[in-house]
Design a protein with these regions (language model features):
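Acyl-CoA/ACP chain-elongation machinery
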Residues: 2-52, 85-99, 133-140, 158-185
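Glycine-rich, phosphate-binding/catalytic loops in enzymes
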Residues: 17-20, 80-81, 145-148
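Condensing-enzyme catalytic core mediating Claisen C-C bond formation in acyl metabolism
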Residues: 28-128
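A beta-strand-loop signature enriched in Asp, Gly, Thr, and Trp
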Residues: 85, 107-133, 140-167
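A general alpha-helical scaffold signature found inside nucleotide-binding enzyme cores
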Residues: 102-106, 145, 178
Length: 185
């Protein structure tokens, strides 16, 4: 079993993210929408549009991983398979202002594996990108660049992109689990 839970909706955590300028604040939302009366909080999180930050979420996501043979023996419904794991972080860099080479390497390795498993046509026509999508202006620019650059290299012209944080907020530690649950359904 792998997973995580976090309940970050506390004054200290909110103030920390507010100080970093990472939260979608009412004033910034109204400025984006040209409003003076009240923000449209239903549109607060906009990963790849004009945006000003994210909303915090609380969450808990746990996933059961097991050998495929055991899952079949137990008659379990299999939702997916982990073909590989790619972690090529940059350690020394500031992740918010700009992605380091590790981010590009991680996505490129995952795309190369998808191409090996699905073929060129499968990667180009039957794949999609589950974005980190925090909805901060910095993330919009850097993540968009990673996706665009690698889509070009791999010949992906029309790549559907989803970002679950736009619907559930940023749960911090469990955010990867939120993304996995969104992918597997």
């Amino acid at each position: 079993m792998v997973g995580n839970a976090e309940a970050p909706i506390t004054p200290e955590v909110i103030e920390g993210y507010r100080t970093m300028g990472a939260l979608a604040e009412d004033e910034a939302l109204m400025a984006l929408d040209g409003r003076t009366d009240a923000p449209d909080n239903r549109r607060a999180v906009r990963p790849f549009s004009d945006n000003c930050g994210f909303t915090l979420a609380e969450g808990a996501v746990y996933t059961i991983l097991m050998d495929d043979t055991l899952a079949l023996e137990l008659g379990l419904m299999i939702h997916g398979s982990v073909a590989n794991v790619f972690v090529n972080s940059d350690g020394f860099k500031k992740s918010i202002p700009g992605p380091g080479v590790g981010n590009y390497v991680t996505v490129a390795k995952a795309m190369a594996l998808a191409r090996r498993l699905l073929g060129d046509e499968g990667l180009r026509r039957r794949s999609y990108f589950q974005a980190h999508g925090t909805s901060t202006p910095q993330n919009r620019v850097t993540e968009s660049h990673i996706m665009s650059a690698l889509a070009g290299i791999f010949g992906v012209e029309d790549w559907p992109v989803a970002a679950i944080k736009a619907y559930v907020g940023h749960s911090l530690a469990p955010a990867g689990g939120d993304q996995l649950a969104a992918v597997l359904g």
